[in-house]
């Protein structure tokens, strides 16, 4: 007897949540840099597959034993065209209060540095390695590319893991 399973493939990987990995005391600066670089690459590859990850806190990413950063929080994902990437508005009036009119689908990439990674030196590392992900122009270009059908699918940064803190 033969059994054929079609159109279904499930991969399970044990990984360490990225925030716990980056908090390890035995981690070298180079290992941190490699993880932050792969985090930026992961975000960009997901976007180029026409997926906006939504909640990009580093606790929503894991790192495998082969030191690959993987995104695993799918509850806020959406298509790239479902978001409105905007620059933070500025005012010429020095007496104006900082106010912001925000629609439900507005995203301000300039704010990403405040929540993707928490520690100052890791934020700086991410900004040095992947400054484009903090710009509205980058995300709008990805939207234009994906709307034309220029979609790059890479499964190296998407999986259904089992969380662990190995």
Sequence positions of predicted segments:
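Conserved kinase catalytic-core helix
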Residues: 29-54
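C-terminal region signature
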Residues: 96-158
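Alpha-helical hinge/cap motifs
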Residues: 55, 60, 159-161
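Conserved small/polar residues in nucleotide/adenosyl-binding loops
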Residues: 1-5, 156-162
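Catalytic activation segment of kinase domains across protein kinase-like and atypical kinase folds
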Residues: 59-99
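Conserved ATP-binding subdomain of kinase catalytic cores across diverse folds
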Residues: 2, 6-18
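Glycine- and acidic
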Residues: 18-30
């Amino acid at each position: 007897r033969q059994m054929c399973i079609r159109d279904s493939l499930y991969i399970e990987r044990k990984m360490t949540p990225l925030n716990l990995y980056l908090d390890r005391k035995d981690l070298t600066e180079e290992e941190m840099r490699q993880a932050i670089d792969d985090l930026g690459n992961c975000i960009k590859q997901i976007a180029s597959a026409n997926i906006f990850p939504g909640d990009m806190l580093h606790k929503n990413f894991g790192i495998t034993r082969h030191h690959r950063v993987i995104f695993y929080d799918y509850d806020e994902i959406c298509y790239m065209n479902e978001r409105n990437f905007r620059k933070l508005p500025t005012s010429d009036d020095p007496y104006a209060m900082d106010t912001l009119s925000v629609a439900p689908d507005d995203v301000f990439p300039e704010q990403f540095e405040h929540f993707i990674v928490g520690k100052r030196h890791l934020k700086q590392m991410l900004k040095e390695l992947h400054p484009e992900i903090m710009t509205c122009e980058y995300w709008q270009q990805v939207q234009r590319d994906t709307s034309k059908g220029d979609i790059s699918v890479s499964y190296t940064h998407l999986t259904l893991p089992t969380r662990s803190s190995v």
